[in-house]
């Protein structure tokens, strides 16, 4: 079921998903959803597999995204051969387009021999053997710490799961139990990647195939702020005394397992840490619990209250600054500056025995800037975590706030 937020309504018209956002002036603006490169790759793969295994042409295909929304894709650039089929889906970013909007995402599905298709990790014991790789214009991972290991195509795990699920569905329909090789390619990918963070992240040769929900939600900054404001006001009206806030769903499983707290119950502030503090105070809250991944909250240690990468990215520099204060050896400092992700940097600190001290230093800086923004009008507590290392630091009253919320 599609979750509804209080400030939004969703509509479907001729296979296109729309929603209306209430603006700050109370007016409604119709906005159109887009679909991720991962959804496009899954749709193209499903169509190519269908044409290969049934021999019938397919000009439209439907897949279900992880969000629960159906993607009705038009199939383009079909090339059929005896043992393989290639086709494409055009990336449509909706009303929140990015650099990949309009790009053709191709999938080639080829009949493969059993011995050339070892089952990928996480594939399970399916009767059909599927190998997923990247071709022209899909980046290749060269640095550790990313979603995929070094050497793999930059096709993240959720798109891989989507591709596998949709192709397995076709294989079951066609009663096919052999092996398939799936290659995702983006002809414009290498050019487009120059305008992304991929070169800096150590992803070379093209773009990444991304997406966790399968859809691109159209959100202007004002629409996001309006939604945050509505949700905070709603929580206050429901009798909550503590504003539970998180930037997103990173660490969702960790928070459920460790604290029995569902991040879905918190107000998602996205990148707007400072604005959310202001709005929570305006809504009448005197307490806030901010739970967040170090990749976002480390920026707050530098006084950055909008954590979007376009506003500034000094994550490693801030980690190094905190590390210097605790005599972290120079080789480790140098290594941190070369890290792609904060997860990787935390592991370096853990390896040299300085993780706890540095995380406490960061937490003190985060609290300093949060309290400065609140200006004495609200008590703010923080839980800082990483996906791989779990809890990194928490402020003195954070656990008490969490117990009250649960």
Residue ranges and their predicted role:
Residues 5-8, 102-104:
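Intrinsic structural disorder/low-complexity segments
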Residues 191, 252, 391:
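Flexible, glycine-rich phosphate/dinucleotide-binding loops
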Residues 13-195, 199-201:
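Generic N-terminal targeting/processing segments that precede catalytic cores or assembly contacts
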Residues 106, 258-261, 395-401:
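Surface-exposed flexible segments
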Residues 129, 160, 363-406:
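Extended hydrophobic packing segments that form well-structured cores
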Residues 48, 159, 163-174, 231, ...:
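Hydrophobic, Leu/Ile/Phe/Ala-enriched alpha-helical segments that form helix-helix packing faces
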Residues 15-18, 32, 38, 201-207, ...:
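A structural signal for small-residue-enriched, beta-sheet-centric alpha/beta enzyme cores
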């Amino acid at each position: 079921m599609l979750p509804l937020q209080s400030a939004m309504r969703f509509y479907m018209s001729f296979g296109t998903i729309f929603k209306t956002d209430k603006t700050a002036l109370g007016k409604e603006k119709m906005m159109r959803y887009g679909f991720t490169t991962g959804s496009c790759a899954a749709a193209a793969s499903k169509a190519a597999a269908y044409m290969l295994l049934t021999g019938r042409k397919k000009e439209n295909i439907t897949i279900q995204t992880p969000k629960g929304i159906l993607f009705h894709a038009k199939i383009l650039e079909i090339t059929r051969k005896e043992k393989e089929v290639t086709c494409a889906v055009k990336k449509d970013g909706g009303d929140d387009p990015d650099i990949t909007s309009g790009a053709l995402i191709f999938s080639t599905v080829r009949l493969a021999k059993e011995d050339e298709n070892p089952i990928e990790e996480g594939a399970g014991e399916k009767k059909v053997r599927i190998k997923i790789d990247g071709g022209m214009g899909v980046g290749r991972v060269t640095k550790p710490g990313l979603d995929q290991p070094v050497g793999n195509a930059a096709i993240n795990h959720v798109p891989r799961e989507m591709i596998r699920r949709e192709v397995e569905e076709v294989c079951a329909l066609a009663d096919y139990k052999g092996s398939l090789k799936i290659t995702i390619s983006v002809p414009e990918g290498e050019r487009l990647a120059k305008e992304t963070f991929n070169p800096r992240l150590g992803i070379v040769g093209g773009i990444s195939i991304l997406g966790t929900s399968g859809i691109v939600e159209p959100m202007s900054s004002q629409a996001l702020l309006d939604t945050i404001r509505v949700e905070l006001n709603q929580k206050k009206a429901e009798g909550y005394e503590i504003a539970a806030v998180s930037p997103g769903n990173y660490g969702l499983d960790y928070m459920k397992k460790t604290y029995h707290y569902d991040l879905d119950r918190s107000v998602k502030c996205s990148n707007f840490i400072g604005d959310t503090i202001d709005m929570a105070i305006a809504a009448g809250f005197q307490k806030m619990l901010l739970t967040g991944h170090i990749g976002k909250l480390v920026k707050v240690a530098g006084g950055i209250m909008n954590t979007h990468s376009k506003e500034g990215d000094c994550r490693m520099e801030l980690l190094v600054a905190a590390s210097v204060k605790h005599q972290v050896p120079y080789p480790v400092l140098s290594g941190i500056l070369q890290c792609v992700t904060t997860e990787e940097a935390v592991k370096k600190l853990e390896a040299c025995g300085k993780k706890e001290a540095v995380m406490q230093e960061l937490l003190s800086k985060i609290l300093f800037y949060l309290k400065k923004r609140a200006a004495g009008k609200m008590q703010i507590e923080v839980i800082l975590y990483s996906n791989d290392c779990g809890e990194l630091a928490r402020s003195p009253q954070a656990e008490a706030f969490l117990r009250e919320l649960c």
